[in-house]
Amino acid sequence: MLIMEDFSLEEYNALKASGVKFNFSEENLVRRDFRGFDLSGENFESANIEGADFSGANLTNTIFIGANLKGANLSNANLTGAKFTKIGIRATVLTDSIFIGANLTDVDLSEASLYRANFQRANLTGAILLKSRIHGANFREANLTYANLTEANGTNLGMGNSVSVFFNHSNLTGANFTNANLENADFSDAITTNCIFDKANLKNSMGIN
């Protein structure tokens, strides 16, 4: 396996296409530029990738277990099936990212920008989304059991009565929405057993009794 060096996008993608294997685990990749890279299936376990730019990258089935992703840019990245178990992604940019079926168990997404991110069928059990910005995010059929969304902001930013956040068919058992702004959110057919909505703004929300 090759250890990551300063390969250009073209060099890396050519090597990957030829079948070369890379090893990103435990590497120091602070503020590295991975824009547009095909990193599908790669292993970043326990790597330090704080502040790295993955915007537009293909991260399908990529492993980030134990990695440091604080302040990284994952906007427009495809993270379908990626594994992020028990790591911190605080203050990370995840705008328009795709997390379909991803494993984000116990991940810290506090203060992250999740605008229009797609978490459909993702596992967010025990995840921390404290003060995260979730307008337009899709959590359909996701598992947010005991997730903490305290002070999460799903406001529709002046877009009228459009749905701000989608929680359709998701499992929200025991989730904490204290002080969250969920105006116009859609909770249709979601499981909300033992959810905490103390002082949450649920104006015009659907599916909440």
What are these model-derived regions, one by one?
Residues 2-209:
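Tandem repeat scaffolds
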